[in-house]
Structures are given as C-alpha cells and as structure tokens.
Amino acid sequence: MRVLITGGAGFIGSHLSERMLREAYQVTVLDDLSTGCVENLRRAFDYPGFEFVEGSVLDATVVRRLVAQSDMVVHMAAAVGVRYVLDHPLATIRTNVEGTHIVLDACAHFGTKTLVASTSEVYGKNVSDALCENADSVLGPSSLSRWSYATSKKLDEFQALAYASTHGLPVIVTRFFNIVGPRQAARYGMVLPNFIQAALKGEPIRVFGDGRQTRNFTYVSDCIDALVRLLRSPEAEGEILNIGSPHEISMLNLAERVKSIVGSSSQIVIVPYDQAYPEGGFEDMRRRVPCICKISRFIGWSPTTSVDEMIIRTIDQAHKRLALPAGLLAHESSPPALLPQR
C-alpha cells in the first residue's frame, strides 16, 4: 500500500514517513522544501519503497499524478511558524487554502482516503478550560496578519468536510496542539527549539510576553502514533479530532526546565511582545488546552511522553547538530526531576 505525504520533508511529515516505511508501507513524499529539508528524510531514503518528489501542492498536475498512484494521502503541506506567517501572509493563505483544495479535489476524483492536518490555532481566542472539537472558533481581526494562518486552516477544515459530504470523500481532520521533538526548526519561531538552541550556546533564553502564558506540548512520536491509528480507523472518517496533551506548562517554567536539563549558564530574559514583534501583527493566547476525550474514545489514544523527556530527546538532536562536546548536558550525568503531570 502506497501513502502520499504532502509536506513530508517537514518536521512531523518526516517522522510519519519513517514510521509508515517501518511498517512496510510504500511512501511518496511531495515537498517544495520551503520549510522542510531533505536531511529530515535521510533515513527514509534507505527504504526501497520510498520516493521523494520535489514539488508544490499548488501544482495540480503533479498532485493529481501522485494521488492517482497512492492508496492513502496525508496532507501535511502548509505554511508554518509564527515568523513565517507574519512575514508571508499571502503565501500562507495561498498555500494553505488553494493547496488543500487541489489535494482534496484530486483525492475526491480518485476516491482516495485522506487525512488533513489542521491546528489548534483554529480555536483562536476561545478561553474554554478544555477545547472540544465542536468548540467555537474565536478569531482575531483581519488587521493582524497572525490570524491569516488560523483562518486559512479553518477554511481547510471546511473544505475537507464539504468534500466528505458532497463527494463522499473518506477524510479525517486532525488538530495538532504544539507538537515538539527532533527536527523541529527554530528559525520559524518554534519555542522549544529556540529555548534549547539558546541554552546550548549559552545565549539568553528569550521568553516572549510575561512568561506566564501556558501551552500543552505533545511529543512527535506520540502524535505519529495517533496518526497511524487514525488512518487505520474507518470510524474516524468524517471526523475532526484533537491531538494534544492535557498537561500545561508556562513558558517561563519551560525555559527554566530547558536551562536546568542542559546545565546552561544562560540568563532567562523576558521580552515584551512589542519588542519581539516590532512590526506588529502578532497576538498571543494565555492558554489553549485540548480535550482529548474524542480521540481516546475512537482509538484509545493519549500521549505518554513527559515534558522533561520531550526536552531531553530534543536536546540530544540539537546537541549533535551543534557538534558540542559529549558530557556537556546536565541530563547525561543525573536524571532530571520530572514535572508533575496534572
């Protein structure tokens, strides 16, 4: 069975590619390498059933040809990262909305099962304690470009469900809540790799806002486990499902944990948002907590990796990338005190 993964050279897509190959699927990755990189697929190239196609989901001819050769499609290609979205609002909208339309249209033509990756950003400013999939989207004003991402991904969800109801397309939509792990790039504003990179270099760890805002991080291998199970679940077709952790951590606490685990001398510096994003267009949420009752009910899934373990595993990759001397990290000599799982 062949799986087409759009955006498969990216952070999550490359991990999914490896997992599917290990489970004896054939995998085709379509990626324009705008934010992904071939290095992420280094292990995938070792498998005879792997194919990489450099190209864009905006190229309808290429997309249709690859969908025709595939038994399932996982649509991960998207504009990602706060910095990228703020700098490229038009490209964000076009890639996310038009690219998803092209993929869904090809999948509907061939009747190919499809999983569309969405985001917790679609909940916007909703302040509910635990966000269920049917919770309202409370999006900010059009004058703030950061909302172009959330709005475009919400339209992707509408498109997916419309293709399901109109054309009978077997489609699943997943909403990711802050997936982290090896291969996540710091350059697009992703918080954990930025903290880790600064700590390893002994540079200031910059915490935006007041540091009391919280997020719920999910390790990439837990996310991949959920995706694989959903692809094998006919009951999940036509559904939207959260993939995330119910356990919160503040950004200041996260920075402190990274500093402690690395054994870094870095200072933690609080940076107000107007200094972090002087060009404007940014607005942050105080907290965003997923309800995972639905996905647990459908496939029995819940994340198992603690925050400290996520940090350690991500540090190990960054450590190798920066070619720092072995034994530098504090966690190599003594185990960290694990965060309480509330």
Short names for language-model regions:
Residues 46, 127, 184-188, 247, ...:
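Residue-level signature of the cytosolic catalytic core of signaling kinases
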Residues 16, 178, 199-342:
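C-terminal substrate-binding subdomain of Rossmann-fold SDR/epimerase-dehydratase oxidoreductases
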Residues 144-152, 176, 184, 188-192, ...:
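The catalytic Tyr-centered alpha-helix of NAD(P)H-dependent dehydrogenases
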Residues 155, 159, 163, 195, ...:
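Hydrophobic alpha-helix immediately C-terminal to the catalytic Tyr-X-X-X-Lys motif of short-chain
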Residues 82-86, 181-182, 276-280:
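A short acidic, helix-capping loop that chelates divalent metal ions and anchors anionic groups
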Residues 105, 163, 195-198, 226-230:
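A short, amphipathic alpha-helix embedded in the catalytic core of nucleotide-handling enzymes
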Residues 38-41, 157, 193, 252, ...:
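Short, surface-exposed alpha-helical segments at coil->helix boundaries
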Residues 1-177, 314-327, 332, 337-342:
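N-terminal Rossmann-like NAD(P)+-binding domain of SDR-like oxidoreductases, especially those catalyzing
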